[in-house]
Structures are given as C-alpha cells and as structure tokens.
Amino acid sequence: RTDFQVRRGAWVALGDTSPALRMALLLSEDRRFHEHSGVDWWAVSAAAWGNLWHERTRGASTLTMQLAGLLDPALQRPASTARGLSQKLAQASAARELETRWRKDQILEAYLNLVPFRGEIVGIDALSHTLFGKSAHALNAPESALAAALIRAPNAPASRVAERACRLLQQMQDLKVDCLS
C-alpha cells in the first residue's frame, strides 16, 4: 500500500505550478474555462447531440463541475455506472454556485490539489514528486502533458496515457505557448 504522506502531498498554490502544467490542464480538461460560469453549455449541447446519435462524445464536465464532484461525494460518479441526469444537474448547480463564490484561480488551484491521478496519488504535489521527483513548479511541457493526460483516465494503460500526452504536447506546440521550455 502507498504511504499516505506520498499519496496526498502538500497543498500547492497556483502560482507555484508551472505555466506548462496550467496550459496542459486547460487544453485537456476545459478549454473554455475562463469563458464560462461553471457550465460549458456549448459542450453540453455537443455531448447531448452526440448521445442522441450514439456517437462517441467528449464529456461536458468543466473543471468547476469536476471540482464540485471532488468536494461533495454525493456528486461523484458511481464507480460502476454513468452519472444520471439528476446527478449531472446537481453537479452543474454546484459548479455555478462555486463560480459565484470562488475566483477562477482558486478553482484551478483547488482542482490541481484535489484531483486523483494514477493509483492512489491525489493532487499535483504528490504526482510531481512521485512520478517526476520534482516540485510542481519545475514540471516541463512533456511532464505537464503527461500529468494532464493522467487525469482523464488515471488507470488507463501506459500506451494510451502516452498517446494522449503526445497529442496534448502537440497542441501546446501548435499554440506556440511560451511555457514550453
């Protein structure tokens, strides 16, 4: 069993995380994070349309909605099933409430510190020290892309995580982000 001190590291202020990590996270999980107020209605519409036509869709949960689930166990998805409509609506309502009380930087900081990564690793401090042997502010672009790739499917096969990380890194390079060093 993993040492519980390693499992959840220290709280890391958002300013103490690398710009590459913040960019990789937003590209991976919520591209319109700074444009919505907790619920990305465009993503909800796209997911609903895809579900209607039985197409594979990307989830519509924003970072704020995911954070609401991390903060309130009643809003977390059951391990064996998908979220029901009522649970999804409750999560959206909680996300909107969070957005009225917290600033975007506070939401992003809390998310990075509470999100589960691979196995029992929770939070960016535990991940950066366990996986990379360094602090969160020292993560470079490839490491940041890998960290963000682990969020979507923390226990996916390594090949799938690596493929996703490579796609994220390419997106970061395509945007010519100045945090790639």
Residue spans of the language-model regions?
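Juxtamembrane regions of bacterial inner-membrane/periplasmic proteins
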Residues: R1-S181
